[in-house]
Amino acid sequence: MAARQQALDAAYAAIKRRIILNELKPGDTLTELGLAKELDCSQGTVRESLLRLQADGLVVRSGHRGTMVTDLDPEVANELLELRRRIEARAARRAAERVTAADLAALVELQARMDAAAAAGDEYGLLALDIDFHLAIFRLARLDALEQILVRCILHTHRSKLWAPRHRRPLAQTSMRHRPILAALAAHDGAALARALEHHVDTIVDVAPAEQAS
């Protein structure tokens, strides 16, 4: 059972990585047989991975058309960004009340790992740690029913960000942007944490002033 779960997790992670990095592009058709050969796993493992990716909003499965990578619709991206902003801000006060010293130590370690990924130029690794960081804070609020929605929002944010290379920050800056969030959480200041998270989401893509005004 453990080996089967490891194979499923590995296949899911591999396909997700290719979608996020735009190696599998919007509209691409994915076949279970083809992916099974590429990933050296069973079609059943691929099928389960695609179901998880559908829950993430990264693929859509249709009986007669197969499985396709979802589009990156700018309007949908903006809606998901706003939804993410609201979910994280809503969780902030509860998280600030419940965070423990052990929780903070784990988040400090995540921040250090983000710094290391940035220094190594590992953009995808940094994005994966970013998800871990935000979910670790969100889970303190114990709003389990909203977690899958938040994951979907964050993954879509990452895809959109990687599609806007002109507005991407240096990786070191991306990592450092999490420090004000961590500081507010360490102070158990729910209002400050909500503001820090809202600012973080609002400024994920570093848009040029002329484009902000348009």
Question: Where are the predicted features?
Answer:
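Conserved amphipathic alpha-helical segments that form helical-bundle/coiled-coil interaction surfaces
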Residues: 80, 101-162, 176-184, 192-203
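Short helix-capping/hinge motifs at transmembrane helix termini and TM-loop junctions
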Residues: 96-97, 142, 166-167
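Short helix-capping and inter-helix turn/linker motifs at the boundaries of alpha-helical repeat units
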Residues: 6, 104-105, 169-172
